[in-house]
Structures are given as structure tokens and as C-alpha cells.
Regions:
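Bacterial Sec-dependent N-terminal signal peptides
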Residues: 1-21
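N-terminal catalytic cores of secreted or lumenal carbohydrate-active enzymes
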Residues: 22-232
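Flexible loop/turn segments at secondary-structure boundaries
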Residues: 41-44, 70-74, 140-141, 169-171, ...
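Structural beta-sheet core signal
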Residues: 133, 164, 205, 298, ...
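Noncatalytic carbohydrate-binding groove/subsite architecture in carbohydrate-active enzymes
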Residues: 180-316
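Carbohydrate-binding surface patches
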Residues: 388-426, 430-436
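C-terminal beta-strand-rich structural cap/linker in extracellular carbohydrate-active enzymes
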Residues: 443-447
Length: 447
């Protein structure tokens, strides 16, 4: 029998102020609370207030458009994402052709005859979100990205930066990007196009994953890129692998058979996540800092996507702690933009919302993300972290040094707790919890 799914209690505490003598207070970076929008507008309707009201409960500060891989084939003046299947097939990547044939079929089925930039603008305006754009640098007209920038500026939507392609270090693109030199040629061309019209807009380049047994195509990718000066930031995609098996750019492609119980299996995943937050995350970023003297944009992050961990309590606790580490860890402050993968789509392991016939489902990450949005509602300027055994506590203070909210990620009791100071010595407490880390949420996001 499961414990209570989502409940609220009120209790009383005294003296919620902090006596710290901190003199300089840095504002928490709101650009770390962002979301990728790949496939969001194909499977979810921005004219459906039941959907947009849920998004507004999260209130994303940043949205990424068009998204991930799809950005490399996006065309501004065409229907939906403007996909041209003959153009995509030319790369000789069967999974691309299959995926985008299916997406085009779905768009036609739903009579989506407008470009999805219209839906994106509507969603961004509803949430007062800034935008990170991804330029198609492999198949678009030269002025496509300029027209996109002009459109967002005409709508008074702030552009944080432009990514020069998405994951173009991936071997899927080796037919025409066989080396970092090929990528630099394309990226510099589009950087020059953007900077000529809009010199104030930052551009980011695609870094290569740093891992053992680097393929020869990637061996000198980062080093050569670090010697260039035409860009402002590097782009890193961060997907933590906790499942044994094979993975490829954020997705588990094969999982080893598991003979242990599900509880033992997820306890192992928990151990790997805790190790990551204790040392691994910082080490991951330091490796890039040692090569590049640039800010870092993490424009996709999540657990490696898998039906095993997707939509579980484990995933929701991971997502909560990842964001809190981004916002509070001084060793991660070179990360200036972060967008979670993904806001909405048709998958179970990547998206907060899953589009279904006649509506959408809510996944386990939703309620914790609404908790975390409280950080920006309360004008938090500092987050202090404390660790007690398997409990990670994040205390959040305002500019007058008052403790406004606190988050407890309790890996022992399998719960995420939000405590809000309501004044007059009262605290409002909300919990998201379940008996087991492998418990999955129902279609309303409850465990």
C-alpha cells in the first residue's frame, strides 16, 4: 500500500531568520530554470487552457526553440517545423527519416498548417519567458535565423542567445560534418551572419562529449574549438547514465538484463545519483572549464532517457536536486543557461507532459517543478546547502536575509519537501513522496 501521494500540512516554528553576516548577495540566476520545447507543439495544444495553465504553474523563465535535433532541419517559412523529408534522407540516417516521417504524418493528421513559432510565441508570452534559439546551420537559407530573431524582437521576447546547431558532433552527421573543421566552417559562417545584424546577441557552439574511448572524429574537437574566438559560449548536454547498457546522446539504446529485485536495482541507481551530486557533476563541468574559457549553456539535461526510470519518483528527485545544485553550487556558476529536456512531447522519460488523444498526461517531474518555481516567486538571492546522511537540505534566503523557503530531498524516506515561511511564525509544508523510488505517477502526476 502506498503512502499519501501529495498532501499539505501546517505547523509552527519560531525564528526563521538567519544570522549570517553575509555582506554581498548574488541574485539567483533565473536563466537556469528553462525548458526545451521539442515536439511540444505537435502533441500539445497551446490554445488548450488546461495545458497552458499547467505550464504556468511551473512558469518557465526560459524556453528553447525549435528544440533539439529537430532544429537542424527546421525552416522558418514552412508548415509546422518545416521538415523536408528528402533533405533529411540525404544524411543517410534511417532513424532520422523514420522519426520525422512520423512527425510529418502527425502534423498533417492534426491539420497543423502554421509554423510552430506562432505557438511558441504564444506560450512564451503567457509565461513571460526568455528564449534560446537553435539555428539550423546545415540546411537553412542564410536569412532564416535572422528572420527568427527579427520576429522575436518584434514580439518583445528577450533572446538570451543562439545555439549554432544541435548535437552536431553526433556521428549521425558525419556525412557532411566529418571533423571539427567542417563544423567550425559552418558555425563561424552563421555566427558572422548573426553578429553582423545583431552584435549584442550571444552565440554558442556545440562541444563534444568528454568520455573514454573517444572516436577519432571527436578527439581534437574541443581543443580546436577552444582556439576559436567567434563565439561566446559552449553548449553541453548533460544526461546522467544510471542504468547499465548502451546509450547514445541522452537515450538508453540497450539495457542489461537485471537479476536483482526492483528495489535493489533502484537503490543502485540512487547510489549513482548521490555520487554524481557529491562529486561527479562538478567534475563533469570542470573538464570543460579546463578546455574552454567560456560560459556554459546546458540546453538539454535529464537522466538518460529510459522507460525504466521515466516518470518515476527517482526521476523527480533527480530533477529536483539537479536544479537546486545548479542554483546553489558555487562550482557550477559558470553555467549561465540551462533548459530541461523536455517540456512536452509523446515520450514517457523525457517530457513533463505527454500528449495523448484528446489531451495530455502529467508526469512525475511536474509537481516538484512547481515547488521549485517558488524560488523565483519569492525573489530568492541565496541558497545554502546542508547534508545530513541521505537528506539534502537547501535553505533559500531573500535580500533581507530572511529564510523564505526550504527544500528537503530525502533519499532515505523517498520524499521531496517544500517548506514555505508564511509569516507570523508559521510554515506551510508540501510533500511529494511514495513508498518506492520505482513508483510511477498516474496521468495526473500523482504517485
Amino acid at each position: 500500500m502506498k503512502v499519501i501521494q501529495l498532501y499539505i500540512i501546517i505547523f509552527y516554528l519560531f525564528s526563521l531568520s538567519c544570522n549570517s553576516q553575509e555582506n554581498i548577495v548574488e541574485q539567483i540566476n533565473p536563466n537556469l530554470f528553462g525548458f526545451n520545447t521539442s515536439n511540444t507543439f505537435t502533441y500539445c495544444d497551446v490554445n488548450d487552457t488546461s495545458f497552458t495553465n499547467k505550464v504556468q504553474k511551473i512558469k518557465p523563465n526560459v524556453l528553447r526553440f525549435p528544440g533539439g535535433t529537430i532544429s537542424n532541419f527546421y525552416h522558418y517559412d514552412e508548415k509546422a517545423y518545416g521538415l523536408d523529408i528528402s533533405e533529411i534522407s540525404d544524411w543517410n540516417v534511417p532513424k532520422f527519416t523514420k522519426r520525422y516521417n512520423g512527425l510529418i504524418k502527425e502534423q498533417k493528421k492534426r491539420n497543423h498548417n502554421h509554423n510552430y513559432i506562432e505557438d511558441f510565441i504564444l506560450l512564451a508570452k503567457k509565461n513571460n519567458s526568455k528564449v534560446v534559439l537553435v539555428a539550423n546551420i546545415i540546411s537553412s537559407e542564410d536569412d532564416d535565423i535572422i528572420n527568427m530573431i527579427k520576429r522575436f524582437k518584434s514580439e518583445n521576447i528577450e533572446i538570451l542567445g543562439v545555439e549554432l546547431g544541435s548535437e552536431l558532433s553526433n556521428r549521425a552527421y558525419k556525412k557532411y560534418i566529418n571533423s571539427v573543421d567542417d563544423y567550425i566552417h559552418l558555425a563561424q559562417k552563421y555566427s558572422n551572419i548573426i553578429k553582423k545584424e545583431y552584435p549584442e546577441i550571444k552565440v554558442g557552439v556545440v562541444s563534444a562529449p568528454i568520455k573514454y574511448n573517444m572516436p577519432s572524429r571527436l578527439l581534437n574537437w574541443n581543443q580546436k574549438l577552444s582556439e576559436e574566438t567567434f563565439y561566446d559560449a559552449i553548449i553541453h548536454h548533460s544526461y546522467l547514465k544510471v542504468i547499465d547498457g548502451d546509450d547514445d546522446y541522452g537515450l538508453m539504446t540497450r539495457e542489461d538484463e537485471v537479476s536483482s529485485t526492483k528495489k535493489a536495482q533502484f537503490d543502485l541507481y540512487k547510489k549513482r545519483i548521490k555520487t554524481y551530486f557529491n562529486t561527479g557533476f562538478v567534475k563533469e563541468i570542470i573538464k570543460y572549464n579546463e578546455i574552454f574559457e567560456k560560459e556554459i549553456w546546458i540546453t538539454e539535461w535529464n537522466l538518460q532517457m529510459s522507460k525504466t526510470t521515466g516518470n518515476t519518483l527517482l526521476q523527480s528527485l533527480f530533477v529536483s536536486q539537479y536544479l537546486l545544485e545548479l542554483l546553489s553550487n558555487p562550482d557550477l556558476q559558470n553555467i549561465s543557461i540551462a533548459t530541461y529536456h523536455n517540456l512536452a512531447g509523446r515520450d514517457i522519460s523525457g517530457s513533463v507532459f505527454k500528449g495523448i488523444k484528446g489531451g495530455f498526461e502529467i508526469h512525475s517531474t511536474y509537481y516538484p517543478l512547481t515547488f521549485l518555481s517558488k524560488i523565483f516567486e519569492n525573489d530568492i538571492v541565496r541558497i545554502e546547502k546542508e547534508v545530513k546522511d541521505e537528506v539534502f537540505i537547501y535553505d533559500c534566503f531573500d535580500s533581507t536575509n530572511n529564510l523564505k523557503i526550504s527544500f528537503d530531498i530525502n533519499w532515505e524516506k523517498n520524499e521531496f519537501i517544500l517548506s514555505e515561511n508564511m509569516g507570523t511564525d508559521s510554515v506551510y509544508v508540501t510533500k511529494y513522496l511514495s513508498e518506492d523510488l520505482f513508483d510511477m505517477s498516474d496521468e495526473e502526476g500523482k504517485l
